[in-house]
Regions:
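N-terminal first-folded block
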Residues: 1-26
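Long, charge-rich, low-complexity alpha-helical segments
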Residues: 27-81
Length: 81
C-alpha cells in the first residue's frame, strides 16, 4: 500500500483535491478514461503522457480498485415489473 501512496497523491490545491499521479497534475481519472476508451498502457505513456511510466498507469488502476473495496455503495433497487 505504501508504494501506491508514493505513486498517487491527493492535495487540496491541485485539481481541487482529486487524486493525481504524484509529482504531476495528471489525474487518476484522466488515465482511467483513456484506459476505458481502449488506449493501451504503452500508448498512454508514449503518446499521451510521455512523462509517465507504465507502473504509474497501473497504480491508477490499483487506486480505483482500492477505492471500490474501501467504500460502500448504495443503489436504489428497482421494482419488478
Amino acid at each position: 500500500m505504501s508504494q501506491l501512496n508514493a505513486l498517487i497523491s491527493v492535495h487540496p490545491e491541485i485539481h481541487f483535491g482529486k487524486p493525481c499521479i504524484a509529482g504531476t497534475r495528471i489525474t487518476v481519472a484522466n488515465v482511467l478514461e483513456l484506459l476505458e476508451a481502449g488506449v493501451t498502457h504503452r500508448a498512454i505513456v508514449e503518446e499521451y503522457y510521455p512523462s509517465l511510466t507504465e507502473e504509474q498507469v497501473r497504480a491508477c488502476i490499483r487506486y480505483a480498485i482500492q477505492i471500490i473495496h474501501n467504500d460502500e455503495y448504495h443503489f436504489a433497487l428497482e421494482k419488478a415489473a
